[in-house]
Amino acid sequence: MNQGKLEVVKQEMARVNVDILGISELKGTAMGEFNSDDHYIYYCGQESLRRNGVAIMVNKRVQNAVLGCNLKNDRMISFHLQGKPFNITVIQVYAPTSNAEEAEDEWFYEELQDLLELTPKKDVLFIIGDWNAKVGSQETPGVTGKFGLGMWREAGQRLI
């Protein structure tokens, strides 16, 4: 993420009072973490190609509660926070598009399952990001409302 874009994101996080921000399609070629003023960024991209990539960006207040971060791969990253009465795990994902090979879809969900198995059972869990899925406007009680977009796709059905 270039410095100009980073400054805009930090300003918007402050303006709308967002403490934790998930980013998809970062398109970086490395993994790691860095701080910029009062924000911390944990990111993971592909080693050679500038595609995919995920990041989690937090403000200083949230950073003080960080217990750890798992830079899994260019499609998912997890973040563990100390909370009360329960700790919190946030997983940021960037799912394959509908035209991806079946093997890539399978790999994505296997990797996600691995992250879920590493999540302590008592944690509050948030999975955020771009699922590249349409769930349609058909209501699924307890899962989706009736205000979805378009017709559901196979990726949407798998997500539900």
For each predicted feature, which ranges?
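A shared catalytic/ligand-binding motif for oxyanion handling
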Residues: 1-160
